[in-house]
Amino acid sequence: MKKKKNILKKLFCLVLAGVLTAALFTGCGSPAGDDSGDTKKEDGADKTAGSGDDKKITVGVNPVPHADILENVVKDVLAKDGWELEVVVFQDYVLPNTSLESGELDANYFQTLGYMNQQNEDAGLHLAAAAGVHIEPMGIYSQKYSSIEEIPDGAEIGIPNDPDNAERGLQLLVQKGFLNSIGDYGRDENYTADSLSNDKEANPHGYKITPLEAANLPLSLPDLDAAAINGNYALGADLPSNYPALEIEEFDDETAVRRTNFIVVRQGEEESEKTQALIKAVQSDEVKQYIEDTYKGSVIASFIEEE
C-alpha cells in the first residue's frame, strides 16, 4: 500500500513538473518519500522513516497462536484507535527477524528473549523486545496413558532435540518427578540422552529418553509412551483437545520472563507511535480474555513491559 502511494506521488510530481517550482518538485522526491520506507543507521540497523500519517502496522508472526491472536483480536482493537494491522505469517524462525531488520516489518511476534538475544549476537541484528504477550507452556502428553502415575518404569519419553528445548523438556521431567536431575546433560558433550537413560541416580525409573525434532514430536507420540512437547506444536497438532497435557510447566518469576513470547521491534523504536499502539492492543483485556477462553491453559497471558 505504501509503495503504491509513493508511486502515485511520484507520478503526480512528474505531471506537474512543468508548472510547479523546482523547489516543490524536489520536495516530492525527498528521502521521506523513498519507496523503501527506511534509512540505514550508522551502526547498521534499519530505521523506519514512516511518519505519523502512516497508520498501518505490519507484524511478522508464526501461525499458532501468534497469527490467531493478532487476526482474531488485536486487529479489531487497533482499528478502534484508527490503526490498520497487516499480519505476515512465516513458517520459520529466521525470516521474521531478518525481515524486521531490513525494514519490511514494523514488528514481529514469535520469540523469546533468549532467542532474540542469540540472533542479535550471531546474525548481527539490532532488535529489541518491546512487550511480553504470552507463554506457551511445554506439556507432557501421551496417547497411551491418562495420568503420569500410569506411566511405567522404563517407558520411552520423547524430548525436543535442540539444546534449549531439550534442557527445558528435561527440567519439566524433573519438575514433575520423572527424573531426580538432568545429570550432566548440556554440560558434558559426552553425556547424551542415552547416558541419562542409563544414569540410575538421575533417572531411577530407567526411562528411555529419546530426543526428536520438536516439530515431529506430536507425530511420533503414538510410538512413544509420553513426550515433552512445546506448546505451539501441541496446539498445531490439536493435542490439547484430543489428548490434554498430563502436566504442564510451572513458572517462577525468572522462568516466566525467559519463556514469554515478546513483541520485538528494531532498536530505537521501542517508544514509537506504532510500537506503543501495538503494545496497548496486544496487552488489552480483550487479548487476555481471548487467550483464556481459546487455549484453556495451553497458552498463558504474560503481559510484561520491557524496561
Which sequence ranges carry the predicted segments?
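A bilobed periplasmic-binding-protein/Venus flytrap-type ligand-binding module shared by bacterial periplasmic
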Residues: 137-149, 258-273, 277
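Short, polar/charged alpha-helical segment
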Residues: 56, 63-86
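Short, low-complexity disordered leader/linker segments with a strong preference
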Residues: 1-56, 304-307
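Ligand-binding "clamshell"
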Residues: 118-130, 144-145, 223, 228, ...
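Short beta-strand-to-loop elements that line the ligand-binding cleft
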Residues: 84-91, 183, 188-189, 206-212
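Periplasmic-binding protein-like
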Residues: 165-174, 282-303
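Short helices/loops that flank or line small-molecule/ion binding pockets
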Residues: 76, 94-106, 121, 171-172, ...
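A conserved helix-loop-strand patch within extracytoplasmic ligand-binding domains
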Residues: 130-179, 288
